[in-house]
Amino acid sequence: MTDVEAAALELHRATLSNGLRVLIAPDPTTPVVGVSVHVDVGFRSEPEGRTGFAHLFEHLMFQGSESLEKLAHFRHVQASGGIFNGSTHQDYTDYFEVLPGAALERALFLEADRLRAPKLTVENLRNQVDVVKEEIRLNVVNRPYGGFPWILLPPVLYDTFPNAHNGYGDFSELEQATLEDAASFFDTFYAPGNALLTVHGDVAEHGVDGVLALVEKHFGDIPARPTPQRPSFAEPVPGSERRQSVPDAHAPLPAMAIGYRVPDPSTEPDSYLAHAMLASVLTDGEAARLQRRLVHADGLVTDVSASNGLMGGPLDARDPDTFTITAVHPSDVEPDRVLGAVDDELDRLAAQGPSVDELSRQSARWASALHREDDRVMFRMLGLGARELLYGRAELALELPARLAALRPEQIAEAAGRLRGAGRAVLLVEPATDQSDQEENS
């Protein structure tokens, strides 16, 4: 989607009597339509003692409903030539389908049906606990650098359970989950007033008013329930450096992650976006600062990357969130040499800022990446829905390229100085010499 097309995208909002918020974004340039439900619950909202429950419940939502047996949801979407999925994030869980425009009502029925009454049974619960455990074994326990840095870094940088715990899931706590836990989680967090429905794409057959009528038809009779009060997850920024080492029996080389707190995007949006641009100036492309210094000039690392946001792109989580720099380095390179070089480059950027050409190059990279993502209805829909749920402004997803392009060198310099002036977390991953050195999550 071009900047002109994005600017012309109309956003229509409504709220049903049960509290469900609705966002409709027609796009006549595509033959498909996307339907998504964003629920305002993620890793940070799950109860202590039930680590991984938000992720587990995402799986349960695909196990049938009171109206449809297990796998029926899959068959209905695939028979329409569509795709579907779901994912759990720090502050939300999303579910979506993308289908030909003529299949819009089918997608609305499917999402409403499971939001009304998912099939919560002991069999489904036990089955999905096993599925999640196997997923964790595959992606974390038995994988080199598994959970690096998004699982391993937060407990070094943060102190509170919501921000520090492993949202993917803890085996022992998952195994203790009961059907009553699942029912309580659904009743509390999956209330209509705690969710947002987004419809984006080809709605020409119905028009906006027709889509709203279909939404009312399928979602309007879901009973209203109290909307949970969203707690603040704020906690103080560390006053000094924190450091921790973890063994990894599968890692061929040592690795390190440096974590910093970033500004709150709801109160300091430009400073937050300057940190996103700073990450690109540091590591995106062969000409980026840390690529030139750490990889090519000094040979201190074999790979380096930076990100503004622990799990996703810009504006994918509420405050607090994390700026990360990760690197893999040879065994004979001391971590403090890498840290010193990173600090040198941040100091230079804080003192002088990036050049105009450097900033222009990274702005172009951002614009290209965001436009490529926006070319797909699925990503555009999920971006609109997430920003509407988290910040009340889906428009933020459309404004990102222009707002990033408008950043000035002095704003990037300020972001670099802010990182140097704050406490940070340093996570060191050390290849374990023996499998027994690796802590098993089983």
Indicate where each model-derived feature is located.
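Histidine-acidic residue clusters that define the catalytic metal-binding segment
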Residues: 2-13, 154-195, 205-206, 210, ...
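Short acidic/His-enriched helical or mixed secondary-structure segments at domain edges of catalytic enzymes
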Residues: 133-152, 234-253, 296-307, 352-398, ...
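Acidic/histidine-enriched segments that form metal/cofactor-coordinating
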Residues: 39, 65-66, 70-185, 344, ...
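N- or domain-start disorder-to-order transition segments that initiate the globular core
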Residues: 1-31
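Active/ligand-binding-proximal structured segments within catalytic/core domains
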Residues: 19, 27-77, 153, 269-282, ...
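A structural supersecondary motif
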Residues: 257-261, 283-328
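An aromatic/glycine/proline-enriched structural segment found at the starts
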Residues: 159, 163, 167, 191-192, ...
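C-terminal regions of mature proteins
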Residues: 2-4, 196-201, 349, 357-442
